[in-house]
Amino acid sequence: MSFDLDAVRAQFPALAIQDNGRRRIYLDNPAGTQVPGGVAAAMSECLLQSNANLGGYFASSAAADEVVDSAREAMARLLNASSAREIVFGQNMTTITMHLSRSIGRLFQPGDEIILSRMDHDANVWPWVLMAKELELEVRWLPFSPETFEFDLHDLDELLTDRTRLICVGGASNLTGTLNDVTSICARARAAGVLSYVDAVQSVPHVATDVQAIGCDFLVCSPYKFFGPHQGVLWGRLDVLEQLEPYKVRPAPTDVPGSF
């Protein structure tokens, strides 16, 4: 399928910026995309028309509630969530993961095990390592082949024990571009009664993402990887989110998703 490349480029004001008379080239584009004019306009309108705390009994607060509710509905459609209540917004994926690790950790006991991967971005590694240190958990590492840059799921089968409580894995590697078979990994986790946490920051921009088909318990992504604002999004299975005790101040909502 062909498309008008010039028309697409025209949607991104940042592509018209020049330095010393030459068009700017964004070599860091994989780390974060530029936003289309429509996104910048929507963000500007939000700041001008609905810049207020949520949950208030006045017009700008009601408008802010509507913006957030609409955004949750949009992300729920993108990820095929069963409910917009399963969508949580945060500063970025790293911050969300660090925050959620504090809540998930309350489910575990000293001596429990978690499985991490050295293929993953540190945002899906270090929060869990810190959690493990604080709670006296054992970290087990899922290796990958240095030839194929893929996981051998037989290795995962050997790592799973009756003490395993959590598996954290990336949907796609930001280093090698490997698309991991997260559906099979999450199926093994589910069969063993283990929670699964998928870092889909690099995969959501490139492949259709269906959390129901993947079968994970949590999935995180970053809208600024696909032309949105610099923010993080967590999808969590509603019944699992409702089991967690969120880290929050007392005035914050008590119900999911606002409690997170």
Give, region by region, the residue ranges found by the protein language model:
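Pyridoxal 5′-phosphate
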Residues: M1-F260
